[in-house]
C-alpha cells in the first residue's frame, strides 16, 4: 500500500522567504539523491506560517531507508545546518499516512 510522508514545520516570523528557499533546496536534493518527488505545501487556515514537505512512497520501508541515510550523514552540511533560525524549535511534526483506498 502507498504511504504519504508529511513533515511540517512552523516558520519563524520574518523568515518566511529564507525558510521557503531552504525547503526548496532540500526538495531539490531529495530528488537528485533519492529520486523522490516532493511537494511544498502551506497550511490554509489555522496556524500561520506552517509549511510542509510531502512525499509519496510505495511503502514505509522506503521512507525508513531514506531516513537512515540522512541520519547516517548523507545530508550535505549546508542543508544539515541551514535551517537554524528559520523554524520554531519543537514545532516540527512528522506524519505518515497510509493510503487505504
Predicted segments — roles?
Residues 1-2, 101:
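Absolute protein N-terminus
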Residues 2-10:
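Active-site-flanking beta-strand signature of metal-NTP-handling nucleotidyl enzymes
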Residues 10, 54-56:
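Short hydrophobic/aromatic beta-strand micro-patches
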Residues 10-21:
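Short, surface-exposed ligand-recognition loops at beta-strand->loop->(often short) alpha-helix junctions
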Residues 21-44, 56-93:
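An amphipathic, aromatic/His-enriched active-site/gating alpha helix that lines ligand/cofactor pockets
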Residues 46-49:
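Short acidic/glycine-enriched loop/turn segments that link adjacent beta-strands
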Residues 92-101:
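Short, low-order "capping/linker" segments at domain edges
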Amino acid at each position: 500500500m502507498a504511504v504519504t510522508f508529511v513533515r511540517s514545520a512552523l516558520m519563524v516570523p520574518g523568515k518566511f522567504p529564507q525558510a521557503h528557499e531552504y525547503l526548496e533546496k532540500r526538495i531539490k536534493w531529495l530528488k537528485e539523491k533519492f529520486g523522490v518527488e516532493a511537494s511544498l505545501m502551506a497550511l490554509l487556515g489555522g496556524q500561520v506560517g506552517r509549511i510542509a514537505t510531502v512525499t509519496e512512497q510505495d511503502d514505509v520501508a522506503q521512507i525508513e531507508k531514506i531516513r537512515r541515510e540522512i541520519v547516517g550523514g548523507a545530508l550535505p552540511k549546508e542543508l544539515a545546518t541551514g535551517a537554524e533560525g528559520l523554524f520554531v524549535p519543537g514545532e516540527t511534526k512528522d506524519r505518515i499516512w497510509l493510503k487505504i483506498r
